[in-house]
């Protein structure tokens, strides 16, 4: 562990740019993607500074030679952030919703819970149906299976079963996902 003063800030993970590249010899690629060959880090930094650009570590070759590129680091970082934001926009996030029922649930209550599950499925959420066994009700596993099957029949027009009912402790869990149109 590192010795640090209590009042000092934690050291940020620094990108391998310019002086922060930990190598004496580097393979340099210029801004036009031309290979300039292996040279000392100092020489490479001078070339980059003469063009008002930065020396950025791209990777390491199997023999240990550090591959660097002469780029505008601020612009590179901005482009990377832009790409990651764009990727996040197009990412679909599936939300998980849970509905709890019991073995001896009434018919109307089951229909009400199924109606709510249909709403969740129409929104595009994944629904976990948990049937809770209280006390010694676990011995009526077949009754629990039947209740979950009845529940699934009520929502089968908008959802499909992702995972079959499985006993997990005192819960019998089943997962339903929306049907693709």
UniProtKB/Swiss-Prot annotation:
SUPFAM superfamilies: Translation initiation factor IF3, C-terminal domain, Translation initiation factor IF3, N-terminal domain. Keywords: Cytoplasm, Initiation factor, Protein biosynthesis. It is found in: Cytoplasm. It holds the Pfam family IF3_C. It comes from the Bacteria. One of its GO terms (molecular function) is translation initiation factor activity. InterPro entries: T_IF-3_C_sf (IPR036788), T_IF-3_N_sf (IPR036787), Translation_initiation_fac3_CS (IPR019813), Translation_initiation_fac_3 (IPR001288), Translation_initiation_fac_3_C (IPR019815), Translation_initiation_fac_3_N (IPR019814). GO terms for biological process: ribosome disassembly. One of its GO terms (cellular component) is cytosol. Its main location: cytoplasm. Belongs to the IF-3 family. Monomer. HAMAP family: IF_3 (MF_00080). This is Translation initiation factor IF-3. It comes from Mycoplasma mycoides subsp. mycoides SC (strain CCUG 32753 / NCTC 10114 / PG1). The lineage of its organism: Bacteria, Bacillati, Mycoplasmatota, Mollicutes, Mycoplasmataceae. The gene is infC.
